[in-house]
Amino acid sequence: MPLKKIPHAFKEICDRVAAATFCNPFDPTRRELYSKLIGRQYDDSDKSDFHALSEAVEKARVSLGNAGILDYRKFRAIDAEKIRMLILFGCYHQIFYLMDEHIESQLKSPGKTIPFRHGGGCVSTLCRNGFSEEESVWYVGVFYQIRRAYYFISRNLIGSSPCMHAFKRRLWNNLFTHDIGNYETCMWDRMEEFSVLLVGETGSGKGSAASALGYSGFVPYDLVKKCFAFDFQDAFVAANLSQYSQSLLESELFGHRKGAFTGALSDYDGLFARCRAFGSVFLDEIGDVPLTAQIKLLRLLQEREYSPVGGRQILGFCGRVIAAANPSIDQHLNDGEFRHDFYYRLCSDRIELPTLRQRISELPSELEAMVQYLIRKITGISDQGLKGMVMEVLSTLKGHDWPGNVRELEQSIRQILMSQHYTPWKEPDDSIDKVDEFARKIKNGSLTASELASGYARHLYDLNGNYESVSKIMNVDRRTVKKYLNRS
């Protein structure tokens, strides 16, 4: 029997669906394609547009099929892929909102695996239309990943300025690559080899971006148990590396064996041991990691293996590394405080976070949108009166460039809700010669040991301009230098 062709009347819709099926949802191209499919401007937030899109695709599928069956294998090669995309597109949109409900149920039940019985129906639909059972089960997992990626990127990262749209597109590509066809054929089970570095100012949202990535990894579907293999929340483990002393840092990362050091009374599984297959480890403040730990992390990234502190056993690491740093990491590279080989291995992808001032300069209404979102986050309600009051106070801050970014904005809202005013932090007046003041306090004997060390560290840093020099002169590690400087 000769292979079929797509009838001319359906060629255009099949071409558009094929182009839109796995298109980055944060790329304007997708909205343009969806708009053409429904014959009007498509709005993601309008359910009537969603239903119109689903109906248009379903109508084409039914018309092209036979008694509800549309086997893509019966079409000639040039058309078979388009029919395959039409089937996948329709199946995904059938369980679109069901997956959103499942995500929200799973968020309320951390550590538990919530059943998703609709996956079986999706598998049956795909199998009837030419897909193998193995393929069909895999696609349920991909649909779930796509839905979580959109859910968490769009909800964790509020904003519609051009720079935020570009940032969200980069995050999406970091999960599925710029071509999801490559992801499907050869990369979906190798993404752990592609680490990512998020670079942004304090308070710009690195943690939110990392959790959006971490919650959006692939999770296989179990057809027998009618549930996904694990809770996506269990696949993301995180640590702020700046909170650990140098002596404890490696233990927290790699774990330790009983007796490895004073106080190691039992074996301890570190961060990497707690990361499961398809999971992610988030290393915040990676720029603060001492050189000795950088060498061990480099080995982990290159060889996918490590050893616990005090142990000889070699353990495998099966997850993905998401790291975050301030823009000062570039200076650390120049100063020799951050290894270049480690940096290159860490940066399969480097994504810059936009600052709040950049976002507002591109789209002034973004400030109001952020205020509305943060008020709801803080109070649990969307109150126009509260928003109006907060915006009125913020309007008095002419020229304020929000150095603390979203975190500062959130705290300003808290202060306004409490006192109806906000006073931004200002850098203290440096008119007094700090060196003379420090010397006077030494002469008067008015400094504590901590103040003496902090003042001296600050003086050395002002002279040399980097942590490494201060560390060598004071004969302390870089982490201690940072602690002194934070106190000064």
Question: Residue ranges of each PLM-predicted region?
Answer:
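Nucleotide-binding/hydrolysis machinery
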Residues: P162, T292-I295, G310-R320, S328-V435
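Conserved RecA-like P-loop NTPase ATPase core
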Residues: L171, L198, S204, A239, ...
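Short helix/loop segment immediately N-terminal to the Walker
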Residues: G181-E193, L223-A229, D269, G311, ...
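Interdomain "pre-motor" coupling segment immediately N-terminal to P-loop NTPase/helicase cores
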Residues: F96-I158, A166
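Pre-Walker A (pre-P-loop) alpha-helix and adjacent loop at the N terminus of AAA/AAA+ ATPase modules
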Residues: Y151-F194
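Conserved AAA+ P-loop NTPase core
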Residues: G207-G319, D330-C347, I360-E362
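Bacterial C-terminal helix-turn-helix
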Residues: M1-M85, M99, S105, Q411, ...
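Walker A/P-loop nucleotide-binding motif
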Residues: D189-A209
